[in-house]
């Protein structure tokens, strides 16, 4: 820590000190000393292609494609998403939490409850604002709210919070989950590896879903199915739904923003929301926290607690989940009328307590051990 403090890197020194690390390694490049929390190439000669391009009020570093290291990743503008990130970053800096070192110091000073309350208030303000916008558009014909987002982005929790806020705006929400409209297991499409492709839009019973959607919007009552993930079949348990005079239909699922899902409904009746986990807090000024790490940790805990999956199972399936997101979710995120950031300032500190013992069950001989070890090293900060 002294080495970094002498070079004016107080953010890095605070992080190392708050993590209780008396010693740490460091990297040197042409006289410049720094530390990176992950793998580095042995020399700059390994980096054959890269580019820097203007992006908003900064620059975007273009890196090689994983599958084709001689070609750069294409530049895909995500203007709405980046704007939400900037707003969250501004709020975070307003409360003096630029990085994990600042967060750890606040916790050590007994300010945990204040950090939690500020985080909750920031999110509730966002939810209330979106609900007010939906209520304002209700008079112009909006009757369907579509909520999408990648795995473990907090869609279901957001959906529940939004429904409460809609009620305060005198709107009656009628909730519908796309998870209940999966095809029976034997009818589910398979991927190139011959495995069931549950991430595909066509894993849903689209004709049946659209038929039920039309009935609801026409004022008819429907019986909502429930998908049994253990048997892989749709079952009916007598749950009925019917829209009232002041109702909006709130549909939640990873494919909700895909135009093909609700192609039979005109856009003027829809309000689209994209939920993501934009982890704006960074480890220090030179090391950011990937949003995918936050979501992966959420999913590991959720799968372990509610689905009986080990950390090894979740880590093994994660690449397939990510491929599905790249194909079926991310291309439609900029179609959203509103975006919601479900990341909490204190979240990673809270996840650590549950995630560490689960990740610790991955054995050294398991293929997933390298990823589990990386996550454990990251959580120690």
What is the predicted role of each segment?
Residues 145-147:
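Hydrophobic anchor at the beta1->P-loop junction of P-loop NTPases
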Residues 154:
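Conserved glycine(s) of the Walker
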Residues 138, 262-381:
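Conserved NTP phosphate-binding and transfer environment spanning the P-loop NTPase/kinase superfamily
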Residues 1-126, 130, 134-138:
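Auxiliary tRNA-acceptor-end handling modules of aminoacyl-tRNA synthetases
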Residues 150:
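P-loop (Walker A) phosphate-binding loop of NTP-binding proteins
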Residues 157-162, 177:
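Hydrophobic positions on the alpha1 helix immediately C-terminal to the Walker A/P-loop
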Residues 164-174:
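Post-Walker A helix-loop "phosphate-sensing" segment adjacent to the P-loop in P-loop NTPases
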Residues 174-176, 183-232, 248:
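Conserved nucleotide-sensing/catalytic segment adjacent to the nucleotide-binding pocket
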């Amino acid at each position: 820590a002294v080495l970094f403090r002498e070079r004016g890197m107080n953010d890095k020194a605070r992080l190392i000190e708050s993590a209780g690390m008396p010693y740490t390694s460091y990297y040197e490049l042409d006289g410049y000393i720094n530390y990176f929390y992950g793998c580095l190439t042995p020399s700059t000669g390994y980096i054959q292609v890269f580019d820097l391009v203007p992006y908003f009020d900064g620059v975007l570093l273009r890196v090689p494609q994983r599958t084709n290291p001689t070609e750069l990743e294409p530049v895909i503008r995500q203007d709405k998403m980046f704007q939400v990130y900037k707003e969250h970053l501004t709020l975070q800096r307003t409360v003096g939490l630029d990085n994990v070192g600042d967060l750890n110091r606040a916790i050590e000073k007994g300010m945990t409850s204040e950090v939690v309350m500020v985080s909750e208030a920031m999110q509730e303000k966002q939810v209330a604002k979106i609900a007010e916008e939906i209520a304002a558009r209700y008079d112009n014909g909006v009757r369907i709210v579509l909520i999408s987002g990648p795995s473990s982005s907090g869609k279901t929790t957001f959906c529940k919070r939004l429904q409460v806020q809609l009620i305060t705006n005198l709107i009656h929400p009628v909730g519908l989950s796309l998870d209940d409209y999966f095809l029976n297991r034997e009818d589910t499409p398979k991927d190139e590896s011959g495995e069931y492709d549950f991430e595909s839009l066509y894993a849903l019973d689209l004709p049946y879903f659209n038929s039920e959607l039309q009935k609801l919007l026409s004022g008819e009552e429907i019986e909502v199915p429930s998908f049994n993930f253990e048997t892989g079949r749709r079952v009916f348990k007598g749950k009925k739904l019917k829209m009232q005079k002041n109702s909006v239909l709130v549909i939640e699922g990873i494919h909700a923003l895909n135009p093909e899902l609700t192609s039979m409904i005109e856009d003027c009746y829809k309000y689209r929301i994209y939920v993501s986990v934009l982890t704006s807090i960074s480890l220090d000024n030179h090391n950011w926290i990937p949003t995918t790490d936050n979501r992966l940790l959420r999913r590991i805990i959720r799968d372990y607690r509610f689905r009986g999956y080990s950390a090894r199972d979740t880590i093994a399936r994660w690449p397939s989940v990510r491929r599905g997101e790249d194909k079926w979710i991310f291309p439609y995120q900029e179609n959203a009328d509103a975006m919601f950031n479900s990341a909490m300032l204190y979240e990673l500190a809270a996840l650590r307590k549950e995630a560490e013992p689960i990740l610790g069950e991955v054995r050294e001989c398991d293929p997933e051990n390298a990823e589990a070890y990386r996550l454990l090293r990251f959580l120690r900060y």
